[in-house]
UniProtKB/Swiss-Prot annotation:
PANTHER family, alphabetized: GLYCINE CLEAVAGE SYSTEM P-PROTEIN, GLYCINE DEHYDROGENASE (DECARBOXYLATING)
Keyword tags: Oxidoreductase
Protein EC: 1.4.4.2
Highest rank taxon of the organism: Bacteria
A Pfam family this chain is assigned to: GDC-P
Name of the gene encoding the protein in the UniProt record: gcvPA
Function: The glycine cleavage system catalyzes the degradation of glycine. The P protein binds the alpha-amino group of glycine through its pyridoxal phosphate cofactor; CO(2) is released and the remaining methylamine moiety is then transferred to the lipoamide cofactor of the H protein.
Keyword Oxidoreductase: yes
One biological process term in Gene Ontology: glycine decarboxylation via glycine cleavage system
Organism, scientific name: Bacillus pumilus (strain SAFR-032)
HAMAP family in the cross-refs: GcvPA (MF_00712)
Listed name of the protein: Probable glycine dehydrogenase (decarboxylating) subunit 1
Reaction equations catalysed: N(6)-[(R)-lipoyl]-L-lysyl-[glycine-cleavage complex H protein] + glycine + H(+) = N(6)-[(R)-S(8)-aminomethyldihydrolipoyl]-L-lysyl-[glycine-cleavage complex H protein] + CO2
Length: 448
């Protein structure tokens, strides 16, 4: 082999040229005018050996500020959670790792069962009747929920709280623009949805009301109070939720939600610089035939043996392209599998315990922050995030924290102009008391 990364030999090239009837590479490209051809040599270094390549890439990777070497208090939708060792072991199996969407389910029983288990666990966590096989991420899941609601109700207006993740709202607006759907944003009041403004925004033309639980500021929204407002005018109630929080919180399905969406990233999926992750989508039975994405169902073959199939496929583009309610081809099955393995490894008790640790440690950090006068004017119960107010730009504070081996919180001023110098702090089960104390002291000493 002449080149390490280009396996064709001169004999291989000659055979290919003979097949197409030309004598040389130059003759192959003879129809390209001389004046537009590049002449000369590219300023590219010679190919590196494997050891040289590994060394160079390792040096580049070492420049990253990762959550293994640094204590991370950054959340805002992507969290530093423990990943059970078994997750990577299972998803690395070749039959899972390289498998594509199972168009022939009779020969993909293992993959279909894994997806079915994911659907079952998500439905149980959310308190809904069924869930699909996954979405791209939490943002697209929320947007797809709004599109489902608009199609189901035949209305062209959706109302979304400003306490919903800003990036999810941006995705929603992108979807809505193409469908000529009006997106109305309801303001926040002390970190929660302003219920008076919400009631005023909802009308008979509203297809859906969208809220987040816990919301972007970490506050647990009062779904019991929002539900009757959301269903006014027969609109659908859509809740975007952190699935880990549902280990402790009342499931949205038991509080009147019609659609529950979110991102399964907290379960066995690394932050990975923002993705890929795994959205989930759960609904009530009445919306079953309008769910986007694949659905795996359980059945029996002619011998009475349990089997799994892709069901309700008439919704999908490879069956009825012009009338499809689903245009997601290759879903996030591998990440859904990772989430399934993590949830299975933890079990109900484990999920509840980790959720409790998140609450406990976040509230300890919040209490410590309060002693320095750092807390922002935000009301309500928190899960694992809360807001603090600083006396200087968050970006400058985070630069100093990095020098101390700490990844600071999210700069809320990026998305909310009125929240300059406000930081969203996330505290997961991985943070120790020493890390929390050091982090809060670094902030507090500059604040006094």
């Amino acid at each position: 082999m002449k080149h390490r990364y280009l396996p064709q030999t001169e004999q291989d090239q000659k055979e290919m040229l003979d097949v197409i009837g030309v004598q040389s590479i130059d003759e192959l490209f003879s129809d390209i005018p001389e004046k537009v051809r590049f002449k000369g040599a590219y300023n590219i270094k010679p190919a590196a050996s494997e050891t040289e390549l590994v060394r160079e890439l390792s040096q580049l990777a070492a420049k990253n500020k990762d959550t293994v070497s640094y204590a991370s208090f950054l959340g805002a939708g992507v969290y530093d959670h423990y990943q059970p060792v078994i997750v990577d072991h299972v998803i690395s199996r070749s039959e899972f790792y390289t498998a594509y969407t199972p168009y022939q389910p009779e020969i993909s029983q293992g993959e279909l069962q894994a997806i079915f288990e994911f659907q079952t666990m998500i439905a149980e966590l959310t308190g809904m009747d069924l869930a699909n096989s996954s979405m791209y991420d939490g943002g697209t899941a929320l947007a797809e929920a709004a599109m489902l609601a608009a199609g189901h109700t035949k209305k062209k207006k959706v109302v979304v709280s400003e306490t919903v993740h800003p990036e999810a709202r941006a995705v929603l607006k992108t979807y809505a623009k193409g469908q000529h759907i009006e997106v109305v944003e309801v303001p926040a009041k002390k970190g929660q949805t302003d219920l008076a403004a919400l009631e005023k925004a909802v009308c008979d033309e509203t297809a859906a009301v969208l809220v987040q639980y816990p919301n972007f500021f970490g506050v647990v929204e009062p779904l019991k109070d929002i539900e009757p407002i959301a269903h006014k005018g027969k609109s659908l109630f859509v809740v975007s939720s952190n699935p880990l929080a549902l280990g402790l919180l009342t499931p949205p399905g038991k509080l009147g939600a019609d659609i529950v969406v979110g991102d399964a990233q907290p379960f066995g999926i690394p932050a990975a610089f923002g993705g890929p992750h795994c959205g989930y989508f759960a609904v009530t039975k009445k919306l079953m035939r309008k769910v986007p994405g694949r659905l795996v169902g359980q059945t029996e073959d002619e011998n009475g043996v349990r089997g799994f199939v892709l069901t309700l496929q008439a919704r999908e583009q490879h069956i009825r392209r012009d009338k499809a309610t689903s245009n997601i081809c290759s879903n996030q099955a591998l990440n859904a599998l990772a989430a399934s393995v993590a949830m299975t490894a933890l079990g109900k008790t484990g999920i509840k315990d980790i959720a409790y640790q998140n609450v406990q440690k976040a509230h300890y950090a919040k209490t410590q922050a309060e002693t320095y006068g750092l807390l922002a004017d935000v009301e309500g119960t928190h899960f694992n995030e809360f807001v603090i107010k600083l006396q200087e730009p968050v970006q400058e504070v985070n630069k100093r924290l990095l020098e101390k081996g700490i990844i600071g919180g999210y700069d809320l001023g990026r998305d909310y102009p009125e929240l300059q110098h406000h930081m969203l702090v996330a505290v997961t089960e991985l943070r120790t008391k020493e890390e929390i104390d050091t982090f809060i002291k670094e902030l507090g000493d500059r604040h006094e």
